[in-house]
Amino acid sequence: MSRRRFDCRSISGLLTTTPQIPIKMENFNNFYILTSKELGRGKFAVVRQCISKSTGQEYAAKFLKKRRRGQDCRAEILHEIAVLELAKSCPRVINLHEVYENTSEIILILEYAAGGEIFSLCLPELAEMVSENDVIRLIKQILEGVYYLHQNNIVHLDLKPQNILLSSIYPLGDIKIVDFGMSRKIGHACELREIMGTPEYLAPEILNYDPITTATDMWNIGIIAYMLLTHTSPFVGEDNQETYLNISQVNVDYSEETFSSVSQLATDFIQSLLVKNPEKRPTAEICLSHSWLQQWDFENLFHPEETSSSSQTQDHSVRSSEDKTSKSSCNGTCGDREDKENIPEDSSMVSKRFRFDDSLPNPHELVSDLLC
């Protein structure tokens, strides 16, 4: 097995199609006003709220550096654009409005998701404010988006609560999947093996350097459901080594104390996804037919007012907790420790609604194999 360095010039699984959306070379500032609201920051990108001068519409401007650690990474950015274009008809994926380019950056003008990350819903402060029916609706929407991607042979590979946004927080809006910087195209001709992702969300096959499949995303959906329902992170340890051990051994707490307010159907759903063998995980399509999700459809058909009132009861608590999202951790476990290291000390108050930085230390120095 040959090994090669993981760099922007030799990453496998990137879409190579030329973007259909025009990449404008005009000055971005001639068309948009940047507000003082910074939505997120990483090592190679920053997202800021902006307003169209012609329409007054709010957007999120994602500034991506074309050179990273001395390497030309324009192909990676074009891949992200291509994935967003491919998914433009899917309402569960963030919409790409325009693209600008200058000498050092490519700027993606994205739909503005005012509700922020669903990570805020994982916080213990909101444990009684988000009902299981709310979680069911969100998980079902995530599955709809992931099913669309998988049907087009795209795996996201960085699904986590920080990369799922809400169109609004009150009433509880619809989800928008963001950050396709780590996504890859999979096919029948080649096997893709890469070490990538955020430590506590890595699937066992990633740690074992086994082939990446759509099942890798399904593992992450299991984690997201677990966090939304229990307000704890299932695998995070005191350090990365302990976290990796928990993942490789699938050490998950299903105790009565942790799952006291979680239904058996929800527990079954999570347990079906958090299994070590990726071939035994259900697909997104199969998950959409799971009894847990179908139960919500049945109840909402006859009692739609319950779902509405559930979302409305969140207003005061959600608004008061929203600003805590960037500073709070889920019982000290839900925070993305690697990402926090990339936020400047003077930006501690910045809301991290977007995550797009490389989650593992020095990922471009890790190894990638493409077996054809």
UniProtKB/Swiss-Prot annotation:
InterPro entries: Kinase-like_dom_sf (IPR011009), Prot_kinase_dom (IPR000719), Protein_kinase_ATP_BS (IPR017441), Ser/Thr_kinase_AS (IPR008271), ST17B_STKc (IPR042763). It catalyses: L-seryl-[protein] + ATP = O-phospho-L-seryl-[protein] + ADP + H(+); L-threonyl-[protein] + ATP = O-phospho-L-threonyl-[protein] + ADP + H(+). Residues 305-362 are annotated as: Disordered. Its EC number is 2.7.11.1. It is found in: Nucleus; Cell membrane; Endoplasmic reticulum-Golgi intermediate compartment. The keyword Nucleotide-binding applies. Residues 33-293 form the Protein kinase domain. Pfam families: Pkinase. The active site is at 158 (proton acceptor). GO terms for biological process: apoptotic process; intracellular signal transduction; positive regulation of apoptotic process; positive regulation of fibroblast apoptotic process; protein autophosphorylation; protein phosphorylation. Its main location: nucleus. Autophosphorylated. Residues 316-326 have a biased composition (Basic and acidic residues). GO terms for cellular component: actin cytoskeleton; endoplasmic reticulum-Golgi intermediate compartment; Flemming body; nucleoplasm; nucleus; plasma membrane. Highly expressed in placenta, lung, pancreas. Lower levels in heart, brain, liver, skeletal muscle and kidney. ATP binds at residues 39-47, 62. PROSITE patterns: PROTEIN_KINASE_ATP, PROTEIN_KINASE_DOM, PROTEIN_KINASE_ST. GO terms for molecular function: ATP binding; protein kinase activity; protein serine kinase activity; protein serine/threonine kinase activity. Interacts with CHP1; the interaction induces CHP1 to translocate from the Golgi to the nucleus. Belongs to the protein kinase superfamily. CAMK Ser/Thr protein kinase family. DAP kinase subfamily. Phosphorylates myosin light chains. Acts as a positive regulator of apoptosis. This is Serine/threonine-protein kinase 17B. The lineage of its organism: Eukaryota, Metazoa, Chordata, Craniata, Vertebrata. The gene is STK17B.
